[in-house]
């Protein structure tokens, strides 16, 4: 009987010791996880921009622009439309490749929404040269951002196919930016 009590007591002490010694360990993301998160956030920003710019030429349905300006806007929309399809294809191949993972601070999101609303109103309620200059300026800025975003992503990318895509996209966006800036000179 004394052995049973001793064994029972020892088991209780052991159980309490094990439960009492259990520690909650913080699980810190691995370097690979952080790298994938940063990559996906960058691609998500690029995808969001590319999606918007792929529809830039739709404004020309209701607004008039001189042929050289309309031509560059259509080139921008076409380039971005192709890039959008390629990014979506990357997502289909690799489900860890995310395109909708932007974690911008709330104030940044609100600021971007306010800018978009203001620019949209300015474009819709302007005409002639004023419209063309504003439209070209917004497109030049968008292509400049896209070119740099693609370059920075490409510098971090390890997948050779995506790396080549990003280098090509950066070059195309830089060319489109330069062409838009040239048109702003006249």
List the predicted regions and their residue ranges.
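His/Met- and acidic-residue-enriched segments that coordinate or traffic transition-metal cofactors
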Residues: 21-186
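Sec-dependent bacterial lipoprotein signal peptides
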Residues: 1-21
